[in-house]
């Protein structure tokens, strides 16, 4: 899982006049290199990341377990879905660029088999 630099650049250049909701689709590793479950490691990451999210005005607005796939391919099997709202794109980018947050991100990477992070804004 790597950051798509072209998408991130495009994201940063969009109008920044409304909140942005980051849709997180997560598939956990069964077992991480440390021997813990991916879900346990991700839970620790989420606890450690929460202060960074709050610091820029972000908030978790919904989370849930992905339990039925009415329309999806085999590769689209996620374990968890999170919606995190930020007051602006700039706020999200500020958090992303924090060296301390980048350190915390290592747990996220250790926990996940794969993930998707989709930026979304409200239709006006």
Model-derived features: positions:
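Short S/T/G/P-rich N-terminal loop/turn motif that feeds into the first structured element of a domain
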Residues: 1-79, 87-91, 121-124
